[in-house]
Amino acid sequence: MVENPYEEVQVNVLSRIIANVEKLNQSVRTLNQELENVNKRNKNLEVMGQICENYHRSVQFNLEATGNKKPPL
């Protein structure tokens, strides 16, 4: 039986590829977790923006309804 003279090199290369793919997968998992955190914070900002916008509309409505709305300075 003839042995493959490149077998050891191929095994080493495959081992390095597998190790690098595992590192890449871990990095992608970490990135996904951070993106989830960013999305949660952005959602909170979006809600706060909607609250401020609704408050502004309410104030404008009440100023118009009471006749107290004045032009900007």
Swiss-Prot record:
Q: Does the keyword Transport apply?
A: no
- Provide the protein's localization: Nucleus; Cytoplasm, Cytoskeleton, Spindle; Chromosome, Centromere, Kinetochore
Predominant location category: nucleus
- A GO CC term? DASH complex
Q: Name one GO molecular function term.
A: microtubule plus-end binding
Superkingdom classification of source: Eukaryota
Sections of the chain in a coiled coil: 14-54
Which GO BP terms apply?
attachment of spindle microtubules to kinetochore; cell division; mitotic sister chromatid biorientation; positive regulation of attachment of spindle microtubules to kinetochore; positive regulation of microtubule polymerization; protein transport along microtubule to mitotic spindle pole body
InterPro entries xref list: DASH_Dad4 (IPR013959)
| Keyword Coiled coil carried by entry | yes
Keyword annotations: Cell cycle, Cell division, Centromere, Chromosome, Chromosome partition, Coiled coil, Cytoplasm, Cytoskeleton, Kinetochore, Microtubule, Mitosis, Nucleus
This chain's function reads:
Component of the DASH complex that connects microtubules with kinetochores and couples microtubule depolymerisation to chromosome movement; it is involved in retrieving kinetochores to the spindle poles before their re-orientation on the spindle in early mitosis and allows microtubule depolymerization to pull chromosomes apart and resist detachment during anaphase.
Family membership:
Belongs to the DASH complex DAD4 family.
> How does the annotation summarize its subunit structure?
Component of the DASH complex consisting of ASK1, DAD1, DAD2, DAD3, DAD4, DAM1, DUO1, HSK3, SPC19 and SPC34, with a stoichiometry of one copy of each subunit per complex. Multiple DASH complexes oligomerize to form a ring that encircles spindle microtubules and organizes the rod-like NDC80 complexes of the outer kinetochore. DASH complex oligomerization strengthens microtubule attachments. On cytoplasmic microtubules, DASH complexes appear to form patches instead of rings.
The name of this protein is DASH complex subunit DAD4
Q: Which organism is it from?
A: Candida glabrata (strain ATCC 2001 / BCRC 20586 / JCM 3761 / NBRC 0622 / NRRL Y-65 / CBS 138)
Organism lineage reads as: Eukaryota, Fungi, Dikarya, Ascomycota, Saccharomycotina
- The coding gene here is DAD4
